[in-house]
From Swiss-Prot:
Name this polypeptide is given: Putative tartrate transporter
Xref: PANTHER family: PERMEASE-RELATED (PTHR43791), TRANSPORTER, PUTATIVE (AFU_ORTHOLOGUE AFUA_6G08340)-RELATED (PTHR43791:SF36)
Similarity comment: Belongs to the major facilitator superfamily. Phthalate permease family.
Organism: Agrobacterium vitis
Transmembrane segments: 34-54, 64-84, 99-119, 130-150, 156-176, 194-214, 259-279, 292-312, 336-356, 367-387, 414-434
């Protein structure tokens, strides 16, 4: 086994030692086949979702948008996302990941490109809403898809690898977006128009690639040997059967109080994530920097977030502990936002944004490992989509409140404190959920061999 493969498999073992040759071989194959590709998909998804933050550096002035108008427009994406999330994930569960994820990517690529032709407030709101509709189902669809392939005791680690694409999107996408903004005037288009057009293209291309590359279920994986395929199918079926009292119906997934609790936890983390993604460029630019300088500075927090996320998820899987891994990360992010509210220099802002990015990124893998511990089948599709759709409304509330408070007070300070408060509430709700339903959030028993 090559050294890089051993290092990757270390993420999936409690003690870092691969003891089962068949398990090791299967995990290696499905990890290298699936994870890098879905990371690339999420990289593009997150970039197209938050590149509006860079567009705002000149678009707001070009189109006469106030901070309130921009905040609402940036956040209204999540209203469309909310309304169509559950239906989209149920369709994915019915028709298969390959076809539905391809549809999602192609339609969001088209709408993302159309953002280059925004003329005013109305078209801005409509296209951002439609982008949310188009992208609905992608993220929870991937979470559901991973639950078809990876055992629960390994899922936080693989989820961390997938989710690392978000901070990586900031690391690589920020300088790219900043550079594209400098294309202002080329062929009569503004820099922000070029940015939308160019960054929409990968989604269209990858949407077609998905049709030929993704495999819906382990049973159809011709790239596994018969022995490997049988082991994986048997393992995943045994895990699902072993849930015993797990909820299976769509209504069970929608009505489960634990689903609602996790959705509210995710609401706070989403508010923090998209406040960071959408407003960070303007928070940095207020110190008099160019678009390219903003891009490079905005990339730095993501570097630390990628490393921290993978290590944090590895520790969560190794210990089988989820609750405090979510709580601690939320508290760290809240502290970072409070620090950012009082920052008086670019260096202080950079430190604060790094703390926020690390905290929010670390909260996600253990959080998203929880719902599939008590949901399966159609209930998992509905429950995961419900958590994501309700939770992502935080992506509307956070950025919108930041814009309104900035217009009202002339400062980002109050808005940053507001979002920090939401993250504090997320931490408290996680503790309440763990106390009332410990089996829903911990995997210690699954990790005992």
């Amino acid at each position: 086994m090559q050294a890089q493969e051993v290092r990757l498999l270390y993420l999936f073992r409690e003690d870092g030692v691969v003891t089962n040759d068949l398990e090791a071989r299967v995990l290696r194959k499905i990890t290298f086949r699936i994870v890098p590709f879905i990371m690339l998909l999420y990289f593009i998804a997150f970039l197209d979702r938050v590149n509006i933050g860079f567009a705002a550096l000149t678009m707001n002035q070009d189109l006469g948008f106030s901070s309130t108008v921009f905040g609402i427009g940036a956040g209204i994406f999540f209203v469309g996302y909310f309304l169509f999330e559950v239906p989209s994930n149920l369709i994915l569960n019915k028709v298969g990941a390959r076809i539905w994820i391809a549809r999602v990517m192609i339609t969001w690529g088209i709408v993302s490109g159309l953002m280059a032709f925004v003329q005013g407030t109305t078209s801005f709101y409509i296209l951002r809403f439609l982008l949310g509709v188009a992208e609905a189902g992608f993220f929870p669809g991937i979470i559901l898809y991973l639950s078809f392939w990876f055992p629960a005791r390994r899922r936080a680690a693989v989820t961390a690898l997938f989710m690392a694409a978000a901070p990586l999107s900031t690391v690589l996408g920020s300088p790219i977006s900043g550079a594209l903004m400098e294309m202002h005037g080329l062929m009569g288009l503004a820099g922000w128009q070029w940015m939308f057009l160019i960054e929409a293209a990968p989604a269209l291309i990858l949407g077609v690639v998905v049709l030929f590359f993704l495999t819906d279920r382990p049973e159809k994986a011709k790239w596994l040997t018969e022995e490997e395929r049988n082991w994986l199918v048997k393992t995943m079926n045994a895990e699902q059967a072993g849930r015993g009292t797990a909820s299976h119906s769509v209504m069970a997934g929608l009505a489960d109080i634990r689903v609602i609790a996790l959705a509210l936890v995710y609401f706070g983390t989403s508010a923090g994530l998209y406040t960071l993604g959408i407003w960070a460029p303007q928070i940095i630019k207020q110190f008099g920097l160019s678009a390219i300088e903003v891009g490079f500075i905005n990339a730095v927090p993501g570097i630390f977030a990628v490393v921290a996320m993978v290590l944090w998820a590895r520790h969560s899987d190794r210990t089988g502990e989820r609750t405090w891994h979510v709580v601690g990360a939320c508290l760290l992010a809240a502290a970072g936002l409070a620090f950012a509210a009082g920052a008086t220099s670019v260096f202080m802002v950079l430190i604060a944004l790094t703390i926020v990015n690390v905290g929010i990124s670390c909260s996600k893998p253990p959080l998203w490992s929880m719902p599939t511990m008590f949901l399966s089948g159609p209930a998992a599709a509905a429950g995961i989509a419900t958590i994501n759709s309700i939770g992502n409304l935080g992506g509307f509330v956070g950025p919108s409140m930041i814009g309104w408070i900035k217009d009202t007070t002339g400062s980002f300070t109050g808005g940053l404190y507001f979002v920090a408060g939401l993250l504090l509430i997320s931490a408290i709700l996680t503790l309440i959920l763990a106390r009332s339903s410990p089996k829903a959030v911990e995997t210690r028993t699954a990790n005992q061999h």
